[in-house]
């Protein structure tokens, strides 16, 4: 008699976290695209975000399409301490690590590309290093949004990279990124309805194109 094949459990996010830095000077910068993604989700789902001292961030909860209860978080701890805020929410609500979806910027992906994964390393991203340290696992989903590399990047020239990630998108890039954020909402909604693994097929195979002028 053959053993029944057990299907892996669906990974459905319950807490969605966007990474960024809290000061106004960081608004609209490439490094804050995670914040922008959570703002886009909050608008799409009519969820109000408000500062929550206990959770060290801007926090809100509501219902996503399909009737899924969802929590949104923008840590206000600065990027390299993001995990503190994430852990504050997961501890309070007794959420597992794999129920947390973290959205953040990625230099290694070109503009218009996104990557959804079920687990993985921090890849040099300080916010993700903190998230992994505080959740004590790498096994949680993450959605990376491509911000591209600096045009004049020289290997080993960290100053060029820093000014790129902390710089703002050009007018043309801003148009493209608004479309990317719409696509991010689509990918996250698919994750909530069908699980992260199913959503990966859509999210990882599509490139958002700049609007034709």
Swiss-Prot record:
Matches recorded under HAMAP family: Pept_tRNA_hydro_bact
Organism: Trichormus variabilis (strain ATCC 29413 / PCC 7937) (Anabaena variabilis)
Lineage, uppermost ranks: Bacteria, Bacillati, Cyanobacteriota, Cyanophyceae, Nostocales
Sites annotated Stabilizes the basic form of H active site to accept a proton: 105
Subcellular location(s) per record: Cytoplasm
Record field: catalytic activity: an N-acyl-L-alpha-aminoacyl-tRNA + H2O = an N-acyl-L-amino acid + a tRNA + H(+)
Protein name from the UniProt record: Peptidyl-tRNA hydrolase
InterPro entries associated with the record: Pept_tRNA_hydro (IPR001328), Pept_tRNA_hydro_CS (IPR018171), Pept_tRNA_hydro_sf (IPR036416)
Gene Ontology terms: cellular component: cytoplasm
Oligomer status and interactors: Monomer.
Residues engaged in binding tRNA: 26, 78, 80, 126
Gene3D superfamilies cross-referenced by the UniProt entry: Peptidyl-tRNA hydrolase
Family to which the UniProt record says this protein belongs: Belongs to the PTH family.
Protein's gene: pth
